[in-house]
A protein has these predicted regions:
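Repeat-based blade/solenoid architectures
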Residues: 1-3, 56-74, 111-123, 160-172, ...
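Solenoidal tandem-repeat scaffolds enriched in leucines and small polar residues
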Residues: 2-5, 13-25, 29-31, 47, ...
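Surface-exposed loop and edge beta-strand positions of immunoglobulin-like domains
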Residues: 5, 18, 76, 89, ...
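Calcium-coordinating acidic loop motifs
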Residues: 5-12, 30-31, 76-83, 100, ...
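Hydrophobic beta-strand segments that make up the repeating blades of beta-propeller
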Residues: 14-19, 84-90, 135-139, 183-188, ...
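Beta-propeller blade repeat segments, especially FG-GAP/WD-type strand-to-loop junctions
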Residues: 23-52, 93-107, 142-157, 195-218
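Surface-exposed intrinsically disordered loops and tails
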Residues: 33-46, 59-66, 234-238, 298-301
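Gly/Ser/Thr/Pro-enriched helix-cap/hinge segments flanking short amphipathic alpha-helices
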Residues: 155-167, 180-307
Length: 307
């Protein structure tokens, strides 16, 4: 399985590879080095990757040195500190690798999100639109786990399904366009699964606003890259049409929220290209900063009003 993200905010995409057997790999993209305003291109015109999982502490070795059977992985800034953290779903204890200045520490046990239920997949999403990323892990042996992020290392699990679904992988997206993230869980068909069952794929509709009468707001954003140069500033303004790899920081009055358009994760799936920001009770944003792949950031200082 793979999970792609710009973990070090240097403008290029890095690749995490979870392996069923053996240590996991992490390929750091070193095509570009430096800050967005002072970038150095390596002489090699092709992407230049170096494997650094062990160095960064995310190889996830087990005591028997065959790894922990990584089956799902996803990047997300769960603590809103402007760098992407990594959640790894294992057939063993899951991991939450907290990213602090490009140094990783497993905090899953401390934050009580290390589900040991044969997890196959994982998805980040702000399901209650409070400005913090929540977490959904798809499991085989027991029901899926839903962790609602309360902040300061606290998570609420009362929203977890109470039935066994045998989920292969999971993605989050606003299926019905109401501003609240829904979840699609792909069922796993096994010849000799638990109780001999063959599990059906499930679509979970988010009913948070119906049941809690939440007043939290939200913003959706769709980016589109261009092959043309507009600013004549010496930089190429070219970006792929789907804006893969673009990173956006939404500036609220008391909080900055970062999201990224990713190229893929887990068992051959990806989250929607449309970015979703929960804004808590804020009616508007102060602005946003868009970091296009491999170029200067573009800052929109105009007032952004929630949809």
């Amino acid at each position: 399985i793979i999970a792609i993200s710009d973990y070090d905010n240097d403008g290029d995409q890095d690749v995490y590879v979870g392996r069923k057997y053996g240590y996991n790999w992490f390929f750091e993209n070193q095509t570009l080095t430096g800050s967005p305003g002072d970038v150095t291109y390596h002489s090699n015109p092709e992407p230049f990757f170096i494997e650094k999982a062990s160095e960064l502490g995310i190889a996830d070795p087990a005591a028997n040195e065959i790894g922990s059977m990584g089956y799902g992985a996803a990047w997300g800034d769960y603590d809103n500190d402007q760098d992407f953290d990594l959640y790894l779903a294992n057939w063993g204890l899951n991991r939450l690798f907290d990213n602090e200045n490009n140094t990783f520490t497993n905090v899953a046990d401390v934050q009580s999100v290390e589900s040991e239920e044969l997890s196959n997949g994982v998805s980040w999403g702000d399901y209650n639109n409070d400005g913090r990323l929540d977490l959904w892990t798809s499991n085989i042996r027991n029901p899926d786990d839903v962790y609602i992020n309360l902040g300061n290392g606290a998570w609420d699990t009362t929203s977890s399904p109470n039935f066994l679904s045998g989920t292969q992988d999971v993605i989050s997206g606003d299926i019905n366009g109401d501003g609240w993230l829904d979840v699609f869980a792909a069922g796993l068909e096994m010849q000799n699964g638990p109780q001999g069952a063959k599990y059906t794929s499930l679509l979970y509709k988010n009913v948070t606003v119906d049941e809690s009468f939440s007043t939290n707001h939200w913003l959706k954003l769709r980016l589109e890259g261009s092959q043309y140069t507009f600013q004549n500033d010496g930089w190429s303004d070219k970006a792929n049409l789907s804006a893969m790899g673009a990173r956006v920081v939404l500036h609220l009055a008391d909080l900055d929220i970062m999201r990224e358009i990713i190229g893929g994760k887990g068992h051959g799936n990806m989250d929607p290209l449309q970015l979703h920001f929960g804004m808590n009770t804020h009616l508007s944003a102060q602005g946003m900063t868009i970091y296009w792949p491999s170029r200067d950031p573009e800052t929109n200082q105009r007032k952004v009003t929630y949809i």
